[in-house]
Amino acid sequence: ALWKTLLKNVGKAAGKAALNAVTDMVNQ
């Protein structure tokens, strides 16, 4: 279903953003 693909993509993007935020915090 289209919404499942959409949900998966949103989850991937959110995970990547969270990972980047954590990396930024560690680097500061």
UniProtKB/Swiss-Prot annotation:
Main subcellular localisation: secreted
Localization, UniProt: Secreted
A Pfam family assignment: DD_K
Tissue occurrence: Expressed by the skin glands.
InterPro entries in the cross-refs: Dermaseptin_dom (IPR022731)
Superkingdom in the source lineage: Eukaryota
Keyword presence, Secreted: yes
Keywords, in A-Z order: Amphibian defense peptide, Antibiotic, Antimicrobial, Secreted
GO biological process, one term: defense response to bacterium
GO cellular component assignments: extracellular region
Keyword hit for ATP-binding: no
Function of the protein: Has antibacterial activity against the Gram-positive bacteria S.aureus and E.faecalis, and the Gram-negative bacteria P.aeruginosa and E.coli. Has antiprotozoal activity against T.cruzi. Has antifungal activity against the yeasts C.tropicalis (MIC=10.9 uM), C.guilliermondii (MIC=21.8 uM), C.albicans (MIC=21.8 uM) and C.albicans ATCC 1023 (MIC=10.9 uM). Decreases viability of murine peritoneal cells. Fuses to, and disrupts liposomes.
Family from the record: Belongs to the frog skin active peptide (FSAP) family. Dermaseptin subfamily.
Protein name: Dermaseptin-DI2
Organism: Phyllomedusa distincta (Monkey frog)
